[in-house]
Amino acid sequence: MKQLIFLLICLLSLLQYRLWLGDNNLSEYVLLQTQIAGQEQSNGKLVARNQILKEEIIDLKRGTEAIEERARNELGMVKEGETFYRVVGSELRERNPFNR
């Protein structure tokens, strides 16, 4: 009976050692869980970004409205018959040395 109790205590000690100090111990487990959570958050942001890009690609393939909007915003395109006006705010006029 004493040998059985001694054997069980040794087994319990070995398991406790592996749990707290051995490979794949509890602290490593917690660290990996935080890394997984961070990676999942990063993946979520990338999935949202990819969805936006997919929608933009579909929009560009379907019609000319998205292409026209992009050309207007990025390239300054003006349609024939339209007049382009640039509105300069008051803060820009104050910084302009030629406007005294």
UniProtKB/Swiss-Prot annotation:
Coiled-coil region(s): 49-73
Gene Ontology biological process terms, A to Z: FtsZ-dependent cytokinesis
Cellular component GO terms, alphabetical: cell division site; cell septum; plasma membrane
Cytoplasmic side: 1-3
Localization per Swiss-Prot or TrEMBL: Cell inner membrane
Segments crossing the lipid bilayer: 4-21
Assigned keywords, A-Z: Cell cycle, Cell division, Cell inner membrane, Cell membrane, Coiled coil, Membrane, Transmembrane, Transmembrane helix
Cited InterPro entries: Cell_div_FtsB (IPR023081), FtsL/DivIC (IPR007060)
Periplasmic topology ranges: 22-100
Bilayer topology term: Single-pass type II membrane protein
Role, per record: Essential cell division protein. May link together the upstream cell division proteins, which are predominantly cytoplasmic, with the downstream cell division proteins, which are predominantly periplasmic.
Similarity comment: Belongs to the FtsB family.
The protein's assembly and partners: Part of a complex composed of FtsB, FtsL and FtsQ.
NCBIfam families, sorted: PRK00888.1
Protein name in UniProt: Cell division protein FtsB
Species annotation: Shewanella frigidimarina (strain NCIMB 400)
